[in-house]
Regions:
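A short, exposed loop/beta-hairpin motif centered on an aromatic-Gly-Thr core
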Residues: 89, 96-100
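Intrinsically disordered, low-complexity terminal and linker regions
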Residues: 1-67, 71-72, 78, 123
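Structured, beta-strand-rich domain cores
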Residues: 102, 108-109
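Active-site and NAD+-binding cores of ADP-ribose-processing enzymes
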Residues: 7-10, 54-59, 63-84, 109-166
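Short connector loops at helix/strand junctions that flank enzyme active sites
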Residues: 45, 94-96
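Short, flexible, solvent-exposed loop/turn segments with mixed acidic/basic and small polar residues
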Residues: 38-40, 83-91
Length: 166
């Protein structure tokens, strides 16, 4: 990565090489207070993370993304591989079950699958902001964050696409 940035007092790794489509999120939360989406690592700013949207046809991915954005249908995954780990951000607690996100775009890409559009293959990832108080992290893997509260603690704000080189 080589870039040393922070958002919400957590590492921020920009999605270099990805096409970004911004969502209209300004003034949509917190009675119009946009501090959560700040870019100065200031108090009240939320962390940046990525969420792979799974495999499937482009039309299926659009439906899934729409559900995640509009209906807030983030759901815990099946495996929950880190649920029993010690939580690095909340000493004395375990991570627990929840929605997996990552501060690493490459990790999210591994969970995004691909879709074909006009004969080209693309990966799709959601860029989200996450309430830093809601993040749980396994002490032995900084690549995975878990949010085990409500989906109000995860706010999508960009859709990312990248053409895969076959």
């Amino acid at each position: 990565m080589g870039v040393n940035k922070q958002r919400g007092n957590r590492p921020y790794n920009p999605p270099l090489g990805w096409i970004e489509i911004g969502l209209n999120v300004l003034d949509k939360y917190d009675n119009g207070d946009n501090t959560w989406i700040g870019m100065n690592n200031s108090k009240g700013e939320w962390c940046v993370a990525y969420h792979g949207v799974g495999r499937g046809k482009a039309s299926d991915q659009v439906k899934k993304i729409t559900g995640l954005i509009i209906d807030k249908t983030f759901k815990p995954g099946y495996w929950q591989a880190h649920s029993g780990c010690d939580d690095q951000y909340h000493p004395g607690k375990t991570v627990g079950e929840g929605v997996y996100i990552t501060p690493n775009i490459s990790t999210a890409e591994g969970f995004s699958g691909t879709s074909d559009i006009n004969g080209k293959s693309y990966s799709t990832v959601l860029m989200v902001r996450v309430d830093p108080d809601a993040i749980r992290g396994c002490t032995d893997s900084g690549d995975y964050w878990v949010v085990n509260g409500t989906t109000d603690e995860i706010r999508p704000y960009r859709i990312l696409y990248k053409e895969n080189n076959n």
